[in-house]
Amino acid sequence: MMQFDRSGLDGSPVDYETALQLQRRLHGEVATGTTAETMLLLEHAPVYTAGKRTTDDERPTDGTPVVDVDRGGKITWHGPGQLVGYPILRLREPVDVVGYVRRLESALIRVLGELGIAGERIEGRSGVWLPGDGTAPDRKLAAIGIRVAEGVTMHGFALNCSNSLEAYDRIVACGIRDAGVSTITEALGRTVTPQDAAPMVVAALQAEFGREAAPRAAQTETAA
């Protein structure tokens, strides 16, 4: 049974380093079988994080601090209004990392469809996108960057719900120069918050990964 933890959506954004330490602890416990698979859903305090393939020219030019992390992908931003999900799951053998990413994308495409948005994959690019229409370029709605060790996943996805896009102007988001970013709110013309999207995300991940979900015990919830 997969546990889910939405305590990071209580209105107090979670510091990135705090969440990272929790992920690492849970990863170790899931890997050894001492904790059930867990999905963390939260909002972060504003932060830039850089995956292993980030180059210097993609970072902020004004010296804004960036947290370097051990996930795939490049630089991105997290902050209030964005729903971040960290599934800590044991992948079935044989481990298929690309297949896992595609399943995360499928779950998020399902959520967007429920909201009335036709999110898509774009060949050669991870994440979920609004395709360009001749008046605007392809725009990313959800970024994905993961790590798998000992057959157990870490890191995850970031779904732009109602966040400002201003912070993206200071970086080359995900290392992609010929595309943009958007939010669910911008696409629909009405406000959709992380708290609004969270139940749909939980249901979509349950359906995609075939896990029954249960709330985490209070004593092990995320510390903000």
Swiss-Prot record:
Species annotation: Leifsonia xyli subsp. xyli (strain CTCB07)
Active site: 174 (acyl-thioester intermediate)
A Pfam family recorded for this sequence: LplA-B_cat
Family annotation (InterPro entries): aa-tRNA-synth_II/BPL/LPL, BPL_LPL_catalytic, Octanoyltransferase, Octanoyltransferase_CS
UniProt gene name: lipB
Any further remark recorded for this protein: In the reaction, the free carboxyl group of octanoic acid is attached via an amide linkage to the epsilon-amino group of a specific lysine residue of lipoyl domains of lipoate-dependent enzymes.
GO cellular component, as recorded: cytoplasm
Site-annotated residues for Lowers pKa of active site Cys: 140
UniProt xrefs under SUPFAM superfamilies: Class II aaRS and biotin synthetases
GO biological process: protein modification process
UniProt protein name: Octanoyltransferase
GO molecular function annotation: lipoyl(octanoyl) transferase activity
Domain BPL/LPL catalytic: 33-213
Reaction catalysis annotation: octanoyl-[ACP] + L-lysyl-[protein] = N(6)-octanoyl-L-lysyl-[protein] + holo-[ACP] + H(+)
Residue ranges, annotated region (Disordered): 51-71
